[in-house]
Amino acid sequence: MAIREIIILPDKQLRLVSRPIETVTPEIRKLADDMFETMYDAPGIGLAGIQIAQPLRIITMDLARRDEEGELTPRPRIFINPEILSASEELSTYEEGCLSIPEYYEEVERPARVRVRFTDLDGKVHEEDAEGIYATCIQHEIDHLNGVLFVDHISKLKRDRVVKKFTKAAKLAAK
């Protein structure tokens, strides 16, 4: 396993539409392991392949839960070729952040519930319903696979401001 570099806004790769994964290979399994290690190191709760410059339709997520003793129980999930089959008309709002837009958070409104189809690392296809933070996170990560960032869901003024800030920081870092 290896920690990979997370690409940061304004990197144009973040706007790429990721390619479907045809079959689960040992390379895809290693990529998934690297993605988990990278996500936990960051730390974050979700990571799309494109965020580590791998334009493949793969997502890792871990929405850990606290048990009765207050200990966090990891819940690692892999989604290969995920797609939203349906979304509720009801909306919910959560404050979102992104490992590719560090230290910037904004409230985003999304469908409160979604039905998702995806393939696991064993090549099995699943369908499941997601709600709450799980629905928000899966939508956020699937957006990445389609070249969409969470800032695309906020006002143009706020979006332009954050893009300008990160573009300026990238130029300063390049000097």
Curated annotation (Swiss-Prot):
Cofactor(s) in the UniProt record: Fe(2+)
Keywords from the named record: Hydrolase, Iron, Metal-binding, Protein biosynthesis
Reactions this protein catalyses: N-terminal N-formyl-L-methionyl-[peptide] + H2O = N-terminal L-methionyl-[peptide] + formate
One Pfam family, short name: Pep_deformylase
Entry-linked InterPro entries: Peptide_deformylase, Peptide_deformylase_sf
Active-site residues, record numbering mapped to chain: E141
Annotated EC: 3.5.1.88
Listed transmembrane segments: none
Gene Ontology molecular function: metal ion binding; peptide deformylase activity
Enzyme class: hydrolase
Residues annotated for Fe cation binding in this entry: C98, H140, H144
Manner of cofactor binding, per the entry note: Binds 1 Fe(2+) ion.
Gene Ontology BP terms: co-translational protein modification; translation
Function: Removes the formyl group from the N-terminal Met of newly synthesized proteins. Requires at least a dipeptide for an efficient rate of reaction. N-terminal L-methionine is a prerequisite for activity but the enzyme has broad specificity at other positions.
Entry's family note: Belongs to the polypeptide deformylase family.
PANTHER family linked: PEPTIDE DEFORMYLASE
NCBIfam families: pept_deformyl, PRK00150.1-3
The name this protein goes by in its record: Peptide deformylase
Underlying gene: def
